[in-house]
Design a protein with these regions (language model features):
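Nucleotide-sugar donor-binding/catalytic module of glycosyltransferases
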Residues: 2-181
Length: 182
């Protein structure tokens, strides 16, 4: 199995599906999508799932898709971010799935580094720490304390850290192998 990981790592041929649930977020969406499009890991598909926006966000999704053929847009009646994520999962074509909230932006090497970390460890999930930024672009205090160094752990240990509120439970910091979801 490790050989498969390393083959994908060196060729960057593994498709990563990035799902973005979208609802009435006209002011932030373009920055979010640009940060995903600008990833150093180029083999991405970006699924914008418009969850019944009423402010023009749905139209912006369509315009963004016209600019980059990696973007696919799905419009659905409002049902909440979980139903939007689930629709994105069902439409994803990638071997890996990641999530980004529509008011967030990500660093250019996020998916490359996370995929390479998972490949090196032979795991089906990798997680990054995150910073929360306020409206004035100042860093907020940590929601959870990030580890001081890289850690490899079992699924059971990872769940324990989440249950003890010692880990980050954000969907947006961890791509997951699609086979892990099925």
């Amino acid at each position: 199995m490790r050989e498969h990981w390393m083959e994908n790592k060196t060729e960057q041929n593994c498709l990563i599906s990035v799902i973005v649930p979208v609802y009435n977020i006209l002011d932030c969406l373009e920055r979010c999508v640009n940060s995903i499009c600008g990833q150093t890991w180029k083999n991405l598909e970006i699924l914008l799932v418009d969850d019944g926006s009423t402010d023009g966000t749905g139209k912006l999704c369509d315009l963004l898709a016209e600019k980059d053929d990696r973007i696919r847009v799905f419009h659905k009646p409002n049902g909440g971010s979980s139903s939007a994520r689930n629709l994105g999962i069902s439409m994803a074509k990638g071997k890996w799935i990641g999530f980004v909230d529509s008011d967030d932006w990500i660093e250019p090497q996020m998916y490359e580094r996370l995929y390479e970390a998972a490949a090196a460890a032979g795991t089906s999930i990798a997680q990054a720490s995150r910073d929360e930024i306020d409206e004035d672009y100042h860093k907020r205090p940590d929601v959870c304390t990030p580890p001081e160094q890289e850690v490899t752990c079992t699924a059971e240990d990872f769940l324990k850290t989440l249950l003890l509120h010692q880990g980050d439970c954000s969907f947006c910091t961890k791509p997951v192998s699609y086979t892990h979801l099925t």
